[in-house]
């Protein structure tokens, strides 16, 4: 999940600022409501390549059901609704009138809690979805279907939770207990699968298939469908928060929680996210954003982030402010006070490292994940925690490790690849994504390689913006999908609204194929080859964990 909006949310609250048209013929399910078309023609690729590999691209990190997270009132719209698109894609009632009360949308989109937006959703969408609209639904199922039809074959749906954000945000309909939120989001994902099945004619017939093993995923992809993996990105999994340095969970709770998540179908997991918890210290956010999120760490744990100066030539965390001045003058006394549970948001000059690494409970969780053949998500761990986690994985020769959205020190990439793990990039704009792909590939050992993206859709982070200069060198519609040449992709249309990646970037999930095709025009066949092998490499990595 993106750091920027979480920080902005805490900043506003802690500072006290509160003030193509419809398909005419329904699918086989009796009484199915009409849904938007995709603008993609042709039959999606099924089977394998001549070398026996599956072909398709990978989203390693998105949040389909985050509309139920954080109390269930922060995000507007749903990825599906039994009553159809008009019911699913409508604005939050609390955004009326004219978006004036939508202080969080206004703040994250325009930099001020004061503003307006046109609240109309389907069928006109005058203001949202948009690449920079963070509180409106980005993953409607027909938009995901467009991406699948154009070549996507794996999607990791990260169930997301953050107790502190839920408790601070004033509007809510759901519990703030993180495990309750994860259970609800897993249930909603199953309900979406069943909804798509009904539209396709019955159980198992839909294109959206939740999978629980690499073998099952490979079978689904060979059928030409989308394999959906459940992951977890929670700030206090299993209730493992901190209270003035004391853990609020036990090994028994961790074991019980892992068993429950595994039974829910979860196969990939983070052990910490945004705030220090009883399992590990986090990788900091920087600058003014980090200052505000640091306040959230204090609200949630009773302590501010704790950082020492460390070498810039070794893995480290992002710098945090304020640094220097009093932070340098009082560095010694501040270190001494830590032993008495007293912290202050003052830091030394230079490179910063979180003093908190992987705790004994965190080691227990990592070992428990390995025992259950789950994928360990390295992102969001402090450099110290990530180093210890990688050491545990190396000692066990365990390949199930992933950096899914550019939130770990790049110096660890070689160790991830050395284990047989996988790396994906955050969904940056086209040119930044290409640069990350090139840097990451240069760190690979030269063997079989595939790459993916972590779009972080519905993670309250921006989607890829329009490419600068696109007006001079645009993606031309319609185009043949570079991932699946058997299909042709035209502009995406939902209701009365038509989107164009050249002018709007990735306004919603349906424009992912356009973003990929545009990058293919910029970087050529090599990036298309590597993205088309994203699904295969993910399955190989996952498969090695189960042997």
Segments the model singles out, each with a brief description of its role:
Residues 1-32:
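Secretory targeting and sorting signals
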Residues 29-353, 360-367, 371, 384-394, ...:
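N-terminal hydrophobic targeting/anchoring segments and the immediately downstream early-domain regions
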Residues 374-381:
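Catalytic beta/alpha-barrel core
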